[in-house]
Amino acid sequence: MRAIAGTSERARLTLALAAGKGSGAAGRLLNIGGGTSFPGAIARRIDPLVLQKVAAASKGRKAVISGSNGKTTTCRMLAALAQANGISVAQNRAGSNLLKGVTSVAVREADLRGRMDAQLILLEIDEAIVRRAAPEVAPDMILVTNIFRDQLDRFGELYSLARMLETAVEALPAHASVVLNGDDALVASLAPSAPARRLYFGLRAGGVGAQVPEHAADTIRCVRCQHPLAYRRVYMSHLGDYECPGCGSRRPDLDVAITCVHASPDGGTDVTAETPAGTVQMHVPLPGLYNVYNAAAALAAAFTLGTLEPANARHALGGLRPAFGRLEEISAGDRLAVLSFVKNPTSYNATLRQILQRPGRKHVLAAHSNTAVDGEDFAWLWDVDLEQLVPDLASLVVSGTRAEEVALRMKYAGFTDMRVIPGRQDALDTALAQTPPGQPLYILAGYTPMREFRRIMQRRGWVPPFWEE
């Protein structure tokens, strides 16, 4: 490193990019990784300013997507909307969203002079590091999807997470934009005096949602005065049309609003959205109301970035498939594995609702661990409405380092006939054996078990490496 210290800034950047590109190619060749984070780590070791330099030298517009849930899918939707209009996109498509992963996008896409040719540089960034990463990227736009309980040992309580996001938003200059979920009271209140232009998205649709928040909802008190919020309509968890009886604060006027939602025969959703660019009719080929929110976020971001053409949006998402681990359907021999990444009560409950809408009794493999990546505080599992699953449950295998706690939670939910198998490969094989041919096995997994299951499936030839999708 002493020799590198005396190297000119331009040569240091070129060396960092070359080393990063080489490490990514080697990893893919040896099948030990897809170059989604290691190239960024190598490049940053040589030149800590590599991301900042590449971002500054690139002419494309730069967008950052952050928040608790929906980042990866929203990014893919926004990329599809841009590409439908002939706009080239560079993104961390595999969802590697820490600094190493974000830097790996720059390493992969830039030439050795440090310039990216893409017209839109689209970066999903973890909510805990966005305040550090955003200044390096200098984005034209930051979008915040939502704030839910997620890894409380890592983030602290919800307001700590909000402050992390707020720091990034406050640093945006006046010519930039911030796109916020207006249906999330905590997100909508972020950095009210920030100079950046503000746009809000959300739902304004009848026929969906409820009148009161579900019992595991996170933010149901006013951010200003802490009075319990009153809801005209709740669409998901604590997201909805709210007003505070105490101080009168309410949901902001929505710039992009989903006004009509209809289930489609393919399991997706047909939506109508009102936007400043006009009415948009669009088919969302992914299930669930949470994907309607992701679509609203993508539309708002596309308008903000100048990449929204209502006429092209209708079929822009037609080729979209679930991101890996998002109700991802995988052919596992003569059975179907449905892999779902669940990490907090909201994502878990939303996934369970989707599973329960499908016919037949359910065969389930639930796997959770408590590594630093997964989050060491697992108490949130007790707020998941697992009771709704029990009447339809045909078989259950639990796995991971927290298998015993999952088993205990299921016993309290009323289901005791389960297998506890800590090892992931044995658990997968047992769960598949308990699933009749032609029927689906639903895999509900935290981050580390999900990656482990996919590695097993990759070795068996059931899925390609995630970086090739």
Describe the residue ranges of each PLM region:
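Short, surface-exposed acidic/glycine-rich loop or hinge patches that mediate macromolecular interfaces
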Residues: 68, 96-97, 276, 287-289, ...
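Buried hydrophobic packing segments
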Residues: 78, 82, 102-106, 295-305, ...
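ATP-dependent carboxylate-amine ligase
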Residues: 1-36, 219, 226, 236-248, ...
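Phosphate-binding loop of NTP-binding sites
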Residues: 8-202, 207-213, 217-221
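Acidic, Mg2+-coordinating active-site environments of NTP-dependent enzymes
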Residues: 60, 144, 148-335
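General small-molecule cofactor/ligand-binding pocket signal
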Residues: 90, 199, 283, 338, ...
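Short polybasic/polar patches that bind polyanions
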Residues: 42, 83, 278, 303, ...
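Short glycine-/acidic-enriched loop or helix-start segments at secondary-structure transitions
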Residues: 75, 131-133, 153-154, 189-191, ...
